[in-house]
Every structure is written in C-alpha cells, then in structure tokens.
Amino acid sequence: RLGKAAVIWRFDPLVLSDDITIDDLVEKIRRIGSQIHEYTEKLVFSFADIMSYKRVRLNLERNNIPYHEWEESQMEEVAERISRLNTDEGWGLQLATCSENIDLERHGITHNRCIDGDLIVRLAWRDKALMNFMGVTISKGGPVAGDMFDNDAIALTDGHFFYSVHKKDQGQRKACLCMAAKDIGEYNTCPHMCEYCYANTSKQAALANWKMHNYNPKGETITGK
C-alpha cells in the first residue's frame, strides 16, 4: 500500500472569472475535502497566473472565458478561508502553495516542494538504488529528528535517519522549490479538455493521441508509439 503520505491532493490552479467566484472555489474545496481528507496528508493549491502563460491566456480567450487575475487581497482571503476549513472541518491537513511568491505563513500555509526529495526518502528509503542515485545516506542509531544535539537529522522508522540533500531544480521558476527531476509526461495527451490547460495546444491533437494510446495502452510511451 502506498499510504496517505504518497497521495497529495492538488487544487491547482484556482481560476477566477465572471462565473467562478471565491465563494465557488472555497465550496468546491470543502466538498472535495470532506470526501478525501482521510486519504491524504496534504493539500497543495496555487492561483492562476494567466498573463504569464500565453498559451493559457489564448485558450481562455478563444473559449470566451472572462477570467480575472488574482489580487493579493483575494489570495489572502482564500488562504484564510482554506485554513479555517482545514480546522473547522477537522481535516488536519498540511497546507501549501505551488510556485507562489506570496507569504501565507500566517495562515499556516507553507511553500511546497511538489517534487520533494525529503518526502521521496521518507517513502522509499529502503530502495538502495534510489537512495544512491539521490546521494542520500541512511543511518541508524545516534541523532534523531528533534535531538538537541542534531536538529538537522530527519527521523525515519526503526531508528533510522538521514540528512536532507534537497537541491532546487535550477531550470524551474524562481518560486518553484522542486528538486531536479526529469519530466516523463507528453504534451497533447489529456482528453479531459480543461479550458485552462497549458499542456494541450490542440484539442484535436490530444484526442488523436488518446486514441493512439487506447490502441496500444502498454506501449513504451503514453501515446502508444
């Protein structure tokens, strides 16, 4: 079993428009959270930055979606309401934002590492090949997390511990805290057709690739090639 720690709930991005208000977004989060909070430990969200992504802007304009850019006061309101939901509904989730500059620590919301080396070690520290690849040394005995003599040690199970070797991926945005990794995805492959999506340049291409995948679902690539 993967366990709750391996399942990250993402509500990403939060999009505002003439038809989608902050109340609508918070209610959607409440409804989803009430059903899945027992199966995850973390909720990660972000605020749609439309003008920074030409493809996204064109997608929305092409489909006549009257989007709004987020103002800082609106971000603060959403953060406060999500934090209150997390407490009032008894979810007890870790809350974090993805690639956001705004500081929401006052609401108990941190900046996330969506590809998190420390989490990977926590989940797969018994995989020696993976640990060697990441440059992580797993030790046993001695210092533990919270030890007054070694606050940098991160505790695992069975008395094991490690020291973080998380290194930011320099190829990502400044606000992105992900570790260096290789993307194995492929553009124009999702058939859900979300109007916001930055990964589909063409609905026709996405549907064509989806059909190719269905012809050869066990192919070496997602498109079955």
Each predicted region: which residue ranges?
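Conserved AdoMet/S-adenosylmethionine-binding subsite of the radical SAM
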Residues: 1-81
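Hydrophobic/aromatic-lined pockets within catalytic cores
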Residues: 37, 87, 198-202
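Conserved residues at the C-terminal ends of beta-strands
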Residues: 46, 98, 200
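Short Gly/Pro-enriched loop/turn and capping motifs at secondary-structure junctions
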Residues: 50, 102-103, 202-203
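A C-terminal junction/extension of Radical SAM enzymes
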Residues: 72-174
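Local cysteine-cluster metal-coordination motifs and their immediate loop/turn environment
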Residues: 173-202
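Short Fe-S-cluster ligation motifs
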Residues: 203, 207, 214-225
